[in-house]
C-alpha cells in the first residue's frame, strides 16, 4: 500500500538540507498588487468601502462595522460552559507566562555624571486580527490580546470577518473570547480590508500603531504593503511542525502530532527527522491507521502527501540537529533520549516542545506559551509573539557638564572625521575647545 507520506533520505549527505525540504509556495508578492486597490479604497472611502467589501468577500453586508456591546454580552452569555472554562484556563496560564516577560527599566552609570537609561514603553494602540473561514480560532484572541495587555498597551481593537450565519457579526465564540478578555472594541471586518482599516482608520476605528495576528495570503499581503505605516508581527505563512525523534519515541504520538498539524491546511507542513528507519516504518504504519479515522482526513491526506511534508532520514541526532536548525520550523518537537540536552542545541525554531508529553497542541491552547510563531524559516532571525513584541526600548541620555567635558574632544574628533562639523559645534558651544580634555 502506498504510504501517505514520502521519505527523503539525507544519510551520507552533508550538504545544506533546505533544498531537500521544500516549503509550500505562497506568492505574497503578487498578492500585494491585488490587495493594493482594496487598501486604497478603504483609505479613501472608509466605512462605506468596508461594508461593500464585506458583502463582496464575506457574502454579508454587516449592519454595523463596530460590534455592539450587547452582542459581546450575548455571545459570552451563550458560550458553552466547557469552552468557557477552557478559555478561562488558557487565559490564566497565558497571563502567568506573559506577565513574567515584562521588562524593567535599567539605568547604566557610564561615567560620574553620565547615565543612559533604557525605558520600556508599550505601543500606544494595537489592532489584533483574528481570522475566520475554515475554522474558528478563539485561541488566537487569547494569544494576541494577553501579551498586549501584559505589556501595558493602553488601546486594543480586534477585527474578525463578518459571518452571514450570524447576521454579519464575527463568530460568537470569537466575540465571547473578546468579552472574557475585557476587549470591547471589536470590528466585523476581515481580510486585507481589516488591515487597511487598522492602518488608516475608518469610522469609529482610530488608526493603530501596530497590527498582529495570523491570516490568509491576502492578510499577509496587506501587512507587507502597509508595513511602515504600521508595525507588524510577521507575515504568517502555512503552519508547520518538525519532529526530531529517535527509536525511543512513541510512534503513535509522533503520528498523532504530524496529523494534528496537517489538519490545519492542505499546504501545512509535517516533517519527521529521524536516524531510525524502524521508527519511520512504525510511524508510517500509525499514519495509515490514524488518518482514516480523522474528521478532516481528506485535508490531512493532502497535507501529508504534499511536497512540503515528509519523513527525513539522517545519519544520527547530530545530523538531525543540523537539518532542523537549517529548516527553522515554526514548531519543533524533540522526542529522543536525553531530550532536554538535545533541545538545548536547537538554535532555530519558533517554539520547542520537549518529550512525550509536550505536544504542539498543548502549546496551541493551554501551555501558557504563545502560539503566534514565525513560519517559513524566518525563525532564523525572528521570534514568536510576546510581551516584548509590544514594547519599545527608549534610551534616555543624561550627562552633566563635567561628564560632557570629559568626552567632548572625542565627539568633536569623530564629527570632523565624518565631515559633520556642526555636530562638533553643538558640543563646543557648551564646552569651549580650551576646556575640552585632550
From Swiss-Prot:
The keyword Oxidoreductase applies. It is an enzyme of class 1 (oxidoreductase). NAD(+) binds at residues 129, 193, 216. Substrate binds at residues 239, 261, 264, 331, 364, 418, 423. Its cofactor is Zn(2+). HAMAP family: HisD (MF_01024). This is Histidinol dehydrogenase.
